[in-house]
Amino acid sequence: MDPYKHRPSSAFNSPFWTTNSGAPVWNNNSSLTVGPRGQYLLEDYHLVEKLANFDRERIPERVVHARGASAKGFFEVTHDISHLTCADFLRAPGVQTPVIVRFSTVIHERGSPETLRDPRGFAVKFYTREGNFDLVGNNFPVFFIRDGMKFPDMVHALKPNPKSHIQENWRILDFFSHHPESLHMFTFLFDDLGVPQDYRHMEGSGVNTYTLINKAGKAHYVKFHWKPTCGVKCLLEDEAIKVGGANHSHATQDLYDSIAAGNYPEWKLFIQTIDPDHEDKFDFDPLDVTKTWPEDILPLQPVGRLVLNKNIDNFFAENEQLAFCPAIVVPGIYYSDDKLLQTRIFSYSDTQRHRLGPNYLQLPANAPKCAHHNNHHEGFMNFMHRDEEINYFPSRYDPVRHAEMFPIPPAVCTGRREKCIIEKENNFKQPGERYRSWAADRQERFICRWVDALSDPRVTHEIRSIWISYWSQADKSVGQKLASLLNVRPSI
């Protein structure tokens, strides 16, 4: 039996209709009433159960990444990186690990069109022999902010107006006018890449900086990158309107239909690494999530391939109840002091416990496929069968022991307790370089999108001036074009 299908279930066992408790139901068409036109009777347990279950079908929507689609497959190592990490699932070329992947839009609600200009989530759960590894990323390699303290406010600004429930540019531009570090992210979001054609033709990135550790304990900072073998394709404005108007679930359907037809999506995994001893050699902070690592200095290194060859069996069980958390790592892969990553480590598991309950890791899509043992038990919706008598540690009656120690990055923590910004902000260099790397027509489309956003009637002269000033510092020509088209002088 498919491990995702847990008994008892009327969908797989009984040839006739039953209640949740297994009692036979001889009539699932009519309610129990006093005569053919009389009152309903509360003793109609099947009716009460049926309605009560229906009333509770919806669970809290994800606060971000609500709109998503999932698929299953495998990850296969193609290149040896055992000199960089002792992670078991990366131990040698040819090793395969089962995975489940969830793609998503970020800001908009469950059921919203998949053609909106929005970052896309790209989250991969590896079911390894040493536990699960969640690589929770996006399609863009950078992010809007570098400190998780700002995350709730950022999401509130990007979400619809709480009064009208309409997403509005003036709110977005007001918030980010206080955060010039967001410019680099906007060179992706307002670029042609802002609306992927579908999930199959989309890159992925781990976004945050992690740490690889080898058997000797040597650590390297690492960035993860997914490259689709079928290439990157995007939708321009008129194309997005046409596609979204015809099918608001076009990306979900494309993913499902492609896998069903045997046209399996595939991505190559690459990494970039930095020796922590060399992190001060750059004009940016390698742990700053608003920066990319230059590929001419830190080249992409091939690692493996991701193939999605099986559609999910049930959307609710394997998409809505599927839960990711950047804190879930395996020996050989660890966190870094990336400020945004440090806050994500707490926030993701916290929101899953709110959304799915304290035992969300027991759900089939989230549970490890390897043996596991601890004393975390009971609580709401605990359905793991346990018959042991020892639920404490240590005990002379239970032979369970500590696992063998694995290397983690050595760290000496010194410094004052303070709330501060990083030293190397350098907010404007990389956005300017990225803009200048584009062809003229691509630059023009980028400018037009900014003019459209800044033309919101509720965007004040002050906010327009600030944005023109920011873009002037990134690339003088961008500021000049925006100032001319908007008839605004930059405020520096």
Curated annotation (Swiss-Prot):
CDD domains: catalase_clade_1. The keyword Mitochondrion does not apply. Its EC number is 1.11.1.6. Keywords: Heme, Hydrogen peroxide, Iron, Metal-binding, Oxidoreductase, Peroxidase, Peroxisome. GO terms for biological process: hydrogen peroxide catabolic process; response to hydrogen peroxide; seed germination. It catalyses: 2 H2O2 = O2 + 2 H2O. InterPro entries: Catalase (IPR018028), Catalase_AS (IPR024708), Catalase_clade1/3 (IPR024711), Catalase_core (IPR011614), Catalase_haem_BS (IPR002226), Catalase_immune_responsive (IPR010582), Catalase_sf (IPR020835). It holds the Pfam family Catalase. The keyword NADP does not apply. GO terms for molecular function: catalase activity; heme binding; metal ion binding. Heme binds at residue 348. Homotetramer. Belongs to the catalase family. This is Catalase isozyme 1. It comes from Gossypium hirsutum.
